[in-house]
Amino acid sequence: MEPSLATGGSETTRLVSARDRSSAGGGLRLKSLFTEPSEPLPEEPKLEGMAFHHCHKDPVPQSGLSPERVQARRQLYAACAVCFIFMAGEVVGGYLAHSLAIMTDAAHLLADIGSMLASLFSLWLSTRPATRTMTFGWHRSETLGALASVVSLWIVTGILLYLAFLRLLHSDYHIEAGAMLLTASIAVCANLLMAFVLHQTGAPHSHGSTGAEYAPLEEGHGYPMSLGNTSVRAAFVHVLGDLLQSFGVLAASILIYFKPQYKVADPISTFLFSICALGSTAPTLRDVLLVLMEGAPRSVEFEPVRDTLLSVPGVRATHDLHLWALTLTYHVASAHLAIDSTADPEAVLAEASSRLYSRFGFSSCTLQVEQYQPEMAQCLRCQEPSQA
């Protein structure tokens, strides 16, 4: 076998057999793999596949929303409308019933509306191309929207906690138990309706919980779920939490309706549900801060990515490895690969990129290939980051 490299990055290996040598009168008869497919060599699909996505996960960006995202947008529109109508009803009902527990439930619905609006906004912005000013596009608008939703919920919840504390100090307040019971019953029905609207039949199954409420990722290696799926699933998780809180408010209203002397259940339930509401925003706030601080994606660890790059044939060392999340569903990686002098830079680049895309689902990878130098082992700038 005599391999030869042709221009254009393709390999044209030809076979030479003893039988061909004798039949040709001492000369060589070259048999091309491209003209005689009866003796093919093993193909390397990974290297060939990289021609279609040389530096991106997707070969060609979509010009509009996919059918899945269109369906997700419809679900979010419907759920947002239902949520807004019943939130307004809870505000009115809570005011008429003088119930802080109802108002707390309405505040939680306000956070849900903000989360769904952020998801809808991100779905719309995902179709806008990057510009020379916004070179990464508008992806982080979703993160900013989630941050605004969390801040607004904290402000409203803080006000309600202050009012509940005043009610515990001074018991000169009256609860309209009938209006409170009616409003709480309607809130339960509203959350059941939103859960039905957002329920995804045949959604991909996943094990474990990501802790991200507005755009969770699948745990482990592999491609993140699409934005449409994650947005609807996050809203569905929100609604399930609201449903449990609405059942709690309903239980408190039933107690006050039949036992008016236990009206203290209203400020007490306000305290409990406010803590639950603030606690439910903790994963979202953590993910938002991680994205804004250019932190590594929670579903991707540093060591496996480094080891994957070092396992590529020809790679001696890697440095300047950076992993960050542009959003919770858009992961980016960049690294320098120090290779042997005998290694083919194009082959190393293609293989390393292919492994990063297939194993970790990065949306964009930037790899710089350079010759290995012994001085790299002592270079302070080439050392790995600390564990913290």
From Swiss-Prot:
It comes from Mus musculus. Expression is restricted to brain (at protein level). In the brain, most abundant in hippocampus and cerebral cortex. The mRNA is also detected in testis, expression being restricted to germ cells and highest in pachytene spermatocytes and round spermatids. It holds the Pfam family Cation_efflux. It catalyses: Zn(2+)(in) + 2 H(+)(out) = Zn(2+)(out) + 2 H(+)(in). The chain crosses the membrane at residues 76-96, 106-126, 146-166, 178-198, 236-256, 264-284. Homodimer. Homodimerization is negligible compared to the human protein. It could explain the lower efficiency of zinc transport. Interacts with TMEM163. InterPro entries: Cation_efflux (IPR002524), Cation_efflux_CTD_sf (IPR036837), Cation_efflux_TMD_sf (IPR027469), CDF/SLC30A (IPR050681). GO terms for cellular component: glutamatergic synapse; hippocampal mossy fiber; hippocampal mossy fiber to CA3 synapse; late endosome membrane; lysosomal membrane; microvesicle; neuron projection; synaptic vesicle membrane. Disruption phenotype: Homozygous knockout mice lacking Slc30a3 do not display overt phenotype with morphology, body weight, lifespan, fertility, litter size being normal. Zinc ions are eliminated from synaptic vesicles in brain of the knockout mice and the overall levels of zinc in brain is decreased. This is Probable proton-coupled zinc antiporter SLC30A3. The keyword Metal-binding applies.
